[in-house]
Design a protein with these regions (language model features):
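Bacterial Sec-dependent N-terminal signal peptides
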Residues: 1-30
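Exposed, low-structure sequence patches enriched in small/polar residues
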Residues: 3, 184, 279, 284-544
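Residue-level marker of intrinsically disordered, low-complexity segments enriched
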Residues: 14, 22-25, 105, 146, ...
Length: 544
């Protein structure tokens, strides 16, 4: 049995065992999603609070827990009818004891849509049946798990993405069926022990997100779930996070075609991520980030987990650099935010892959100047309108930034980037607005991206992170967006009526439009209108 499935099975056993026993919690655990997280903006980004906001997912406790309970209990209907209570107010199964809580929900996600612009005019649909369970024991143990069985027909551009990457975006391996149908499973599990108000340990099959933006140039929640152990420490104004991850990349080749066919991979990789966040005051926060990725096997043979990286200190670079022939991929980064107004926060990131001072400031397009930048602003109650939240963001990455000399040790997980979905060699501007009123939720998103892709002969232009940086054609004269020029315009609008906020059961209607103009090629155009009965808080990234 795969480690992730074994872990999930053990967690589900614990859930049932404790949930049905006779055992009011003060903490909650839930996967991260932007659309849910933005509802906490007035607490997270208020100049009256001093919370660590950039390491996600985080536990809901104290004022966040109060807000969580408020959001999931709002608009209760007064009814003694069991069906009406379960439909509008309660979890399907709910246990609230003095020192523990337990809940279980069925999560339907049914959607049907129609392609209005693309020439194939296909009917799109999603048929998902899921379960979620949550358990707390006093204020020490928190557990969350979900499982989804899915079939779907996607728009053309997502169909093409899955054909190349062999995954549903952010949700793992996909099986191709007839007539464009896809079949896949998706699961999440997270078990946290809270030693005190200062230290937490989490074992999870989930994702992580470092940053205050919608995207992250450091570590994002875009790729599929992976098994990891996370330590979080909070002392005064300092929060420290250390993550040790076991990841899969089954698509990666097992042989190095550039080195006489030497073996360098078995589809397994490891990662260590450290993040140190310091709240200077109520308005300013600064964080330091570093990561290292290594293959489970390389030319020297089986390696497994490297215990040199078990050191929880934020000093991985010296450890890695002591090995002059290190096959590991290393990154360092900076994350910062400043609450410029009562209801607006500016944020940013800087990622550094390689640095040579002479070349970095030389302005000569040196290929090994590998960096990425994010700048953004987000806020709440825009124009004095209660619950009108917003975000505007700019992201850029130099060519070759996330590549490595072999793809198994690049900055990816299960065939997708660990940072920005576009990989590298791009500029991107995006904006998101969310508004909630009574039981209604509205969202509007727009994205513009200019990026370069590889030509037909496969020359490495720096955007495809699965290429080897040993195949860089020109060491100098490189620029962002080089290669085949692409211009992407994406817009998405949704309106939903929330039936049950406990598990986000909602009636939803939406329209998604995507135009991609490719140099000297026919433009790719798509416009899909959809309606559905949806639930859960999981993210699905189709905006790429």
């Amino acid at each position: 049995m795969k480690p992730s499935l074994l872990f999930l099975s053990c967690c589900l056993f614990l859930t049932v065992f404790f949930g049905l026993s006779n055992l009011i919690a003060q903490v909650k655990n839930q996967p991260y999603s932007y659309q849910h997280s933005q509802k906490y903006n007035e607490i997270l980004y208020s100049p009256n609070t001093r919370l660590h906001t950039s390491s996600k997912p985080f536990l809901f406790r104290n004022e966040l827990l109060v807000k969580y309970d408020s959001l999931t209990s709002m608009h209760k209907t007064s009814s003694d009818n069991w069906f009406m209570r379960k439909l509008f107010n309660e979890h399907l199964v709910e246990v609230n004891k003095e020192d523990h809580t337990f809940y279980l929900d069925f999560l339907p996600d049914f959607q049907i849509g129609s392609e209005l612009i693309n020439s194939d005019k296909r009917t799109t649909w999603l048929n998902t049946r899921g379960l979620q369970a949550g358990l707390t024991i006093k204020d020490k143990f928190t557990f969350y798990a979900n499982f989804f069985e899915n079939q779907a027909v996607f728009p053309n551009y997502l169909d093409d993405y899955m054909g190349v990457n062999e995954v549903v975006p952010g949700q793992g391996a996909v099986e191709n069926l007839s007539n464009h149908k896809k079949d896949w499973m998706y699961a999440t599990a997270s078990l946290t022990y809270d030693f005190s108000d200062y230290f937490q340990l989490t074992l999870a099959y989930d994702k992580n997100h470092i940053g205050d933006g919608y995207r992250s140039m450091l570590l994002s929640d875009f790729s599929s779930n992976y098994t990891h152990l996370k330590f979080t420490g909070n002392i005064g104004n300092v929060q420290y996070t250390s993550i040790w991850a076991y990841m899969l990349d089954p698509k990666n080749p097992r042989r190095d075609s550039l080195d006489s066919g030497g073996r360098f991979g078995d589809g397994i990789k490891w990662g260590a991520f450290q993040y140190l966040d310091y709240n200077v005051n109520n308005r300013l926060s600064i964080g330091l980030f570093q990561s290292v990725i290594w293959a489970n096997s390389n030319q020297a043979g089986y390696r497994g987990f490297d215990f040199n990286y078990i050191n929880p200190g934020i000093l991985l670079r010296p450890v890695e650099s002591t090995n002059s022939t290190s096959p590991d991929k290393m990154f360092m980064g900076l994350n910062a935010k400043y609450k410029v107004l009562k209801n607006a926060t500016a944020y940013g990131q800087f990622l550094l892959g390689e640095f040579t001072a002479k070349e970095f400031f030389g302005g000569n397009g040196y290929a090994h100047n590998k960096w990425g930048v994010q700048l953004g602003v987000r806020g709440y109650d825009a124009f004095g309108i209660r619950n009108l939240n917003f975000l505007a963001e700019y992201n850029v990455a130099r060519p070759y930034t996330y590549q490595h000399f072999v793809s198994i040790s690049n900055y990816s997980n299960h065939g997708e980037p660990l940072a920005h979905p576009r990989g590298a060699n791009f500029h991107e501007v995006l904006g998101i607005a969310n508004y909630s009123w009574n039981r209604f939720d509205f969202s509007l998103q727009g994205v513009y991206s200019r990026f370069g892709t590889d030509p037909a002969d496969g020359s490495n232009m720096g955007g495809d992170i699965f290429q080897s940086y040993r195949t860089i054609p020109n060491m100098y004269g490189n620029s962002i967006g080089q290669g085949i020029e692409n211009n992407l315009y994406y817009a998405d609008a949704k309106a939903a009526y929330v039936l049950n906020p406990k598990y986000n059961l909602r009636l939803e209607v939406g329209y998604t439009q995507r135009f991609r103009y490719i140099e000297d090629q026919t433009a790719q155009k798509s416009g899909v209108i959809s309606v559905g009965l949806r639930s859960s808080f999981r993210n699905f990234y189709g905006d790429m």
